[in-house]
């Protein structure tokens, strides 16, 4: 609200969610979450110092960047979860208090398996963000058409049966992550449901299936090895990672732009082995 633009609000929300996701994934069962505003009594107005809360959430965000987005620690230390010049501290504290009441890991799916948070987040990107940013993301229906036209589902079955692995998928301009998310959903559904009967029955394939698609609450483990996304826009790269997690995956390799603008943070040198 106020003088804060829609794009700034969107990125602030993304970064706060990333910090909360990291906190939920890494906090021990016997420890309290750091992503919250602590109270010293039953009085809701008796809250901790806002600056101390901001510093703690900011540290969470920086840890999330290095752990989940492959950001070098030196660069992460220079970044802030929310720019206080664009959004006042009182608004940041209010946002944290609102988000702390929800679990983004446990509460992700509905009873019928629908990724409610993922669908909600994608709708924000598709219907709101693009209009203010001037970026146009490919509609989900077109993405699905392209994936099926490329016969990614059949190729996945063929690769597992013949080579005991999946195809490698890379989106060099990942945008909001829609291609990667739909690839992930389609491949997982193909292997586990639609074409499961087409998998060969032998120990190697059973082991590959169990290692990469089981248990059901972590059925996208395979993405860690086979899905890659690159996005030069650092903030949008962060949004992709959040989008992937909210749609059921925290494993995909997402690389966002660095100072060189190449979007490939871990790589310094490239060796061309052949012309293929």
Locations of the language-model features?
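Accessory nucleic-acid engagement/destabilization modules that flank
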Residues: 1-29, 33
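Conserved S-adenosyl-L-methionine
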Residues: 139-273
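Long recognition/docking surfaces used for binding and targeting
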Residues: 18, 25-129
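Short amphipathic alpha-helical segments and their helix-coil junctions
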Residues: 1-4, 97-104, 169
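Non-catalytic, well-ordered alpha-helical scaffold segments
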Residues: 7-16, 93, 114, 118, ...
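Short, intrinsically disordered, charge-balanced linker/junction segments flanking boundaries
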Residues: 1, 272-276
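Short, charged/polar micro-motifs that form catalytic or ligand-binding hotspots
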Residues: 3-8, 106-110, 132-136, 230
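Class I SAM-dependent transferase core
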Residues: 118-148, 152
């Amino acid at each position: 609200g106020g003088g804060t633009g829609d794009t700034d609000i969107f990125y602030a929300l993304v970064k706060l969610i990333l910090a909360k996701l990291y906190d939920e994934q890494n906090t021990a069962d016997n420890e309290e979450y750091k992503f919250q505003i602590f109270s010293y009594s039953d009085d809701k107005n008796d809250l901790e110092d806002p600056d101390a809360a901001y510093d703690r959430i900011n540290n969470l965000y920086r840890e999330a960047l290095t752990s989940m987005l492959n950001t070098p620690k030196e660069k992460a230390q220079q970044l802030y979860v929310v720019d206080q010049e664009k959004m006042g501290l009182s608004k940041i504290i209010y946002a944290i208090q609102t988000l702390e009441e929800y679990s983004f890991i446990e509460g992700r799916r509905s009873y019928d398996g629908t990724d409610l948070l993922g669908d909600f987040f994608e709708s924000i990107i598709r219907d709101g963000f693009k209009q203010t940013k001037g970026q146009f993301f490919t509609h989900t229906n077109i993405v699905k058409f392209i994936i099926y036209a490329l016969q990614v589902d059949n190729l996945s079955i063929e690769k597992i049966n013949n080579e005991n692995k999946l195809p490698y998928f890379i989106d060099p301009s990942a945008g909001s992550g829609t291609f990667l998310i739909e690839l992930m959903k389609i491949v997982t559904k193909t292997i586990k449901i639609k074409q499961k009967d087409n998998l060969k029955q032998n120990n190697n394939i059973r082991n590959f299936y169990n290692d990469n698609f089981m248990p059901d609450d972590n059925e996208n483990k395979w993405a860690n090895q086979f899905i890659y996304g690159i996005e030069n826009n650092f903030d949008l790269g962060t949004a992709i990672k959040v989008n992937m997690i909210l749609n059921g995956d925290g494993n995909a390799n997402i690389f966002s732009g660095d100072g060189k603008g190449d979007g490939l943070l871990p790589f310094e040198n490239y060796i061309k082995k052949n012309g293929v």
